[in-house]
Amino acid sequence: MRRSMKRRRRRRPVAPATAARGGDFRAEDGAGLEAREEKVVYSRSQLSLADSTKALGDAFKLFMPRSTEFMSSDAELWSFLCSLKHQFSPHILRSKDVYGYSSCRALVPDPPGPPTARGQARRPVPRAAARRRRRGARAAAARRRKPRPPPPPPPPPEESCPAKPVAPGPCFGGRTLEEIWRAATPTLTTFPTIRVGSDVWGERSLAAARRRARQVLRVNLEPMVRLRRFPVPRA
């Protein structure tokens, strides 16, 4: 009993030290747990495809039989996927890449001049906008220099008065429409005509009219013949 009491007495003063040590251990354990949690998070962020690499490998083996060259490690597979991402990623073309100038500018630049020698230094070509501004400034200065023409003099009082109405003269050179029609009627029948005395609708008379038209008019009327009555004044 004495020995046990002595042992207990000896252990009692050591208790606060052990408690401090236990606290230290707990603090160290907490720091270690935090470090482990950080490591776990870090490992998860880096190896997010650790479980799905096998499925990716099986898919590549099915669709791309020759793709087993980069299947030795996850790093090679990851680099291969990154290369595919960069290779097949869409490239957005800007108007500057296609046309050589930005689309926000309404003025199209002039085409480049002929290539100069290699030894000579290339001078910066002035832009079309600067050229047009200079031309506009020159034109405005020239307009300012030109004197304005004097205003026209006011018209005399005689011209400002309204003109008197003119009496209408005889129309068509003093002739009426009936006189003009009578004068023009004989000229309408001056072309050669063919008179058909017999029945027009008979085949024989129509054939005779065609023959006579060939002799007089020198026209072949066999393809189409159109006959109508035309009043001809008797001589």
UniProtKB/Swiss-Prot annotation:
Protein name: Coiled-coil domain-containing protein 71L
Compositionally biased region (Pro residues): 149-159
Phosphoserine carried by residues: S52, S89, S198
Sequence segments annotated as region (Disordered): 1-30, 109-167
PTM annotation (Phosphothreonine): residues: T185
Keyword Manganese: no
The keyword Phosphoprotein is annotated on this UniProt entry: yes
Pfam families cross-referenced by the UniProt entry: CCDC71L
Lineage start: Eukaryota, Metazoa, Chordata, Craniata, Vertebrata
Keywords, comma-separated and alphabetical: Phosphoprotein
Basic residues composition bias: residue spans: 1-13, 120-148
